Amino acid sequence: MSAKTKHHLRDRKVFAALLRSKRRFFSTFLMAYFMPNRVRTWRAAVSISKTKYKLAVERNLIRRQVKAIMREQFCNLNAVDVLVIINQGFLELTFKEKQTIFLNLCQKLQELDAPKPK
């Protein structure tokens, strides 16, 4: 089962805005840029550099795993755009370790989504 089209992020203007955004999540194996959007659902894009992973098979495996984790953990997020950039070494992690990294990212995104106290 693939991620729904409404969760795909493809607009270059949004990519540029995400990269300029001050809201970031850094991990050893990935960087995530995020910001609120006007759509009522979360949207995500995964970027994997050819210089870090030469084989398309590896890049596709990473992309499938990341999308599976996002579908599982981002289900209760609202109105946020996320750009995930994968770094070297991500492929060597176990699936459970990858889930832990994305769980931390999801908690950070829920803080963004939560109403601010007055």
From Swiss-Prot:
It is an enzyme of class 3 (hydrolase). InterPro entries: Ribosomal_Su5_D2-typ_SF (IPR020568), Ribsml_uS5_D2-typ_fold_subgr (IPR014721), RNase_P (IPR000100), RNase_P_CS (IPR020539). Pfam families: Ribonuclease_P (PF00825). The keyword Hydrolase applies. GO terms for molecular function: 3'-tRNA processing endoribonuclease activity; ribonuclease P activity; tRNA binding. One of its GO terms (biological process) is tRNA 5'-leader removal. Keywords: Endonuclease, Hydrolase, Nuclease, RNA-binding, tRNA processing. It catalyses: Endonucleolytic cleavage of RNA, removing 5'-extranucleotides from tRNA precursor. Its EC number is 3.1.26.5. Belongs to the RnpA family. RNaseP catalyzes the removal of the 5'-leader sequence from pre-tRNA to produce the mature 5'-terminus. It can also cleave other RNA substrates such as 4.5S RNA. The protein component plays an auxiliary but essential role in vivo by binding to the 5'-leader sequence and broadening the substrate specificity of the ribozyme. Consists of a catalytic RNA component (M1 or rnpB) and a protein subunit. This is Ribonuclease P protein component. The lineage of its organism: Bacteria, Bacillati, Mycoplasmatota, Mycoplasmoidales, Mycoplasmoidaceae. The gene is rnpA.
